[in-house]
Regions:
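A charged, amphipathic interaction segment
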Residues: 84-146
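C-terminal alpha-helical interaction appendages
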Residues: 2-103
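Single conserved hydrophobic/aromatic residue that forms the stacking wall/gate
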Residues: 151-162
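Intrinsically disordered, low-complexity regions enriched in small/polar residues
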Residues: 58, 127-130, 149, 153
């Protein structure tokens, strides 16, 4: 049985928060998706989220996370009004699905990003957004396995170095 960083009771809210974060960052602040996500990764916001800090998975909005990531990145950008969109964008789905995958697997957001970029996840939207989330998990797990096989091939083992 997998032990998750936080209770499944928080999962739905956490998915909405990460979805709103990606949506707001891309569609209001107009960050390119990969650029903002990389800022998220190097801030401690990603660590707080993936370890299940209740402030991040239940207590803040996606808009608040975006503003915190911007602040922690050292960018001096005027704060924009909080916007939550009724129509859910591909960026929203990307964050929503990614939050589920991270929670389900326990892998860090950074490790996931090494295996699959945000652009790749966004490209999955037309086909996967209507499917059960388990199909998304299967596909990202396949990409994870491909990534692992590549790094194991490209890095010599200790025995090979002797």
């Amino acid at each position: 049985m997998m032990i998750h960083a936080y209770s499944e009771d928080y999962l739905n809210n956490a998915q909405k928060i990460l979805g709103d974060m990606m949506d707001y960052a891309v569609n209001t602040y107009e960050f390119p998706p990969n650029q903002f996500y990389e800022m998220f990764l190097v801030s401690d916001v990603s660590m707080q989220f993936q370890t299940g800090n209740p402030t991040y998975v239940a207590g803040k909005t996606g808009c608040e996370l975006v503003k915190e990531v911007i602040r922690k990145s050292g960018l001096l950008i005027p704060e924009l009004e909080d916007e939550m969109y009724l129509d859910k964008s591909p960026e929203y789905w990307c964050g929503w699905a990614l939050a589920y995958y991270q929670w389900y697997t326990g892998r860090s957001f950074m490790k996931i990003y090494h295996a699959v970029s945000i652009e790749e996840i966004l490209n999955m939207y037309p086909v996967y957004h209507e499917m059960d989330i388990s199909r998304f998990v299967e596909t990202i797990n396949e990409k994870w396995d491909q990534y692992l096989s590549l790094i194991h091939i490209s890095e010599p083992t200790r025995l090979q170095l002797i």
